[in-house]
Amino acid sequence: MSDSPAGSNPRTPESSGSGGGSSSGGGGGKRPAVPAVVSLLPPADPLRQANRLPIRVLKMLSAHTGHLLHPEYLQPLSSTPVSPIELDAKKSPLALLAQTCSQIGKPDPPPSSKLNSVAAAAANGLGSEKDPSRSAPGAASAAAALKQLGDSPAEDKSSFKPYSKGSGGGDSRKDSGSSSVSSTTSSSSSSPGDKAGFRVPSAACPPFPPHGASVSTSSNSSSPGGSRGGSPHHSDCKNGGGGAGELDKKEQEAKPSPEPAAGSRGSGGDSAHGGPEATASGRKSEPPSALVGAGHVAPVSPYKPGHSVFPLPPSSIGYHGSIVGAYAGYPSQFVPGLDPSKSGLVGGQLSGGLGLPPGKPPSSSPLTGASPPSFLQGLCRDPYCLGGYHSASHLGGSSCSTCSAHDPTGPSLKASGYPLVYPGHPLQPAALSSSAAQAALPGHPLYTYGFMLQNEPLPHSCNWVAASGPCDKRFATSEELLSHLRTHTALPGAEKLLAAYPGASSLGSAAAAAAAAASCHLHLPPPAAPGSPGSLSLRSPHTLGLSRYHPYGKSHLSTAGGLAVPSLPTAGPYYSPYALYGQRLASASALGYQ
């Protein structure tokens, strides 16, 4: 710096303290006489050198103004910015990201931080004029903080934890840039002092999680009204009076949420409603388990009981070879009594008639938790098979003993002895056998995929599925198919196992037992003439048999009126219902089933 050019102004303490040297024409305001004279002196003049500051002092003075990215942005930011340069650095996306990352994993603020957060909210009211990125007005936030000091635990400003559950039952942790206590409420049902948790449910309007209470993670850069969202707590509730949606604010503030189990995880709104705050907050949430009222728009979710948004009738109507698609994710109101340890096969009305213990509550779904063993243990390895209980040969008590290999939920019905295991079709008598059930399905609209050709030269295919894969051999007649299936089912000791069950005495021979076992195991259509509807062939995937259940097919009740159901006696080569619910055979593991 000692050899600076002659025209530059020497750095005096006044000029350097103000933030850097000015040009020769502009620096004369502070020293009126000297700069005009000194500017004409050469750089090596002693008078000019005497007025100069040491380089070390200059570096110390200009250290905080030389660069934009100040190291302080890595720390939790204070409520008021220090300088305009630091303010710009704090609003940058990199600074916001670093601030968020530096605060992950910090412990919850102690209870003594309530007063601190109120003071910080008051300071936020002062700083909100300088910083336009504050998401709520400062005075309103301070007033809300003072009002809510006794209601809900106020949040520390430097503890934004996106994954922590709120200690007040659902209060959301705010970003450090947003106000300490949220004034983001529904425009129709409550006012700015509302608790940032769950609305207190009334008798007329079922509760919803407030979407306005979810503050997005980027709320530093949001507009002043950006975090205000209308919560789906509609005021035009159909099942109540005119003002049913208007909840009392005092009641909401006085009571905490009475149903923490119905709340969403974290504090975000229900993501099925797709509010702007719910999608921006990035927090996973579960839909509340309370039933949706008649006036609300239910989110379409297969795991939540609500309005009937699926083309399926109620569970009092039985289905051919299906359990109403519970494994396919239909609402649990169509599958009322599902319990892995009890009978998962009967509808709610039938299980009540049989005196069975009830299953899970109707609000639960078989897919909400982990995969239930009643569906996964008994699954056939055929990719299009959802278990032996989906076969139409089980209707009306026509079954076989080896189906217990598919069905682990059976033994609880063994003592009941009722011949009709499933809720019957309205047109189906209780004494309907398997062949009648097959002949009564001319089109079987559950299987809308593929081509169904009656005049197939080899209509009978072997659907045996072992550990090595499906067999897929084709035969012209059902007798040839059954004789081929005996090669699959011929195991040492199988006849003894089949004869050990009570219904085995009604069989004509062990060959008939093997045929019935093969027909039930492989979901094959029963023996029928090649042109009859029972021998239809599905060409497309794996040439599936008609009694296969497909989870994505349409409901078959559209053609239920045209079904001609003949009444056949139950006597014949079919087992009694006791045989279906015997213990799992030892041959089941040898056959490739689980």
From Swiss-Prot:
Compositional bias (Gly residues): 17-30, 345-356
Molecular function, one GO term: zinc ion binding
Gene3D superfamilies: Classic Zinc Finger
Subcellular localization: Nucleus; Cytoplasm
The keyword Iron-sulfur appears for this protein: no
Spans annotated as Disordered: 1-37, 100-298, 345-370
Cited InterPro entries: Elbow/Noc_ZnFinger (IPR051520), Tscrpt_rep_NocA-like (IPR022129), Znf_C2H2_type (IPR013087)
Modified residues (Phosphoserine): S257
Record PTM Omega-N-methylarginine, positions in chain: R584
Compositional bias ranges of the Low complexity kind: 134-145, 177-191, 212-225
Record's compositionally biased regions (Basic and acidic residues): 246-256
Expression tissues: Expressed in mammary epithelium.
Modified residues (N-acetylserine): S2
UniProt keyword Nucleus, yes or no: yes
Pfam family, one: nlz1
Cellular-component GO terms for this entry: cytoplasm; nuclear matrix; nucleus; protein-containing complex
Keywords: Acetylation, Cytoplasm, Metal-binding, Methylation, Nucleus, Phosphoprotein, Repressor, Transcription, Transcription regulation, Zinc, Zinc-finger
Role noted for this protein: Transcriptional corepressor which does not bind directly to DNA and may regulate transcription through recruitment of histone deacetylases to gene promoters. Regulates cell adhesion, migration and proliferation. May be required for segmental gene expression during hindbrain development.
Family in the record: Belongs to the Elbow/Noc family.
Subunit structure: Interacts with DCAF7 and PHB2. Interacts with TLE4; increases transcriptional repression.
Protein name: Zinc finger protein 703
